[in-house]
Amino acid sequence: RDPEMSRGLGDVYKRQEYPHAGYGGMFRRWLHAENPKPYGSFGNGSAMRVSAAGWLFDTLDKTLEMAKMTAEVTHNHPEGIKGAQATAAAIFLARTGHSKPEIKRYVEQTFGYDLNRTCDEIRPTYHHVETCQETVPEAIIAFLESVSFEDALRNAVSLGGDSDTLACITGGIAEAFYGMPQELRDETLKRLPEDIREGYELFRWNIGQR
């Protein structure tokens, strides 16, 4: 666990710039703790927030290492770490020119997720669930079935359940694979507060300097 990362997360929250951003109860308690420690979560938040790790590093091994680090600050259950690593690995493979069959095979063999279902098979019985093991595979399947960035997001949202998290995970992989249409990028950026836009621009600059 990286204490600097823990403090950084806590400091951002305690500035109270976004008090209604939908933090979970366990996360709120973690942030207010005097000495915050991981709380054994296998929730899908670790996968939802990991996409940057898939972009910033030059090797898959380093990507997996950093995905683990970002997860275990809070989500140190093996399933929480696995969900973050699978998502980051899929993004890394997508942005480095690997095909969908290659991405699917790697995720299945490395993390043991079942990616042989279809969105049509998932929808009838899917429900709101916030675990990595019942969110990350479905999000990856939504990407695998897609034909474009927007189609991937539509697939993810169409599953129901924790749709914003599904779309976040799917969208991270889809952008790495397809790119993001400029009109969607522009519209999204217009809706963000200035400080978050500045963070985005710094992130894009860092990617360009790799």
Please identify what each model-predicted range represents.
Residues 1-13:
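Single conserved hydrophobic/aromatic residue that forms the stacking wall/gate
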Residues 38-45, 80, 131-132, 160-163:
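Active-site nucleophile and cofactor-binding loops and adjacent substrate-binding regions
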Residues 40-42, 60, 64-83:
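Phosphate/ribose-phosphate-bearing ligand recognition and processing surfaces
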Residues 59, 67-73, 86-89, 139-209:
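Catalytic phosphate/nucleotide-handling subdomain of diverse soluble enzymes
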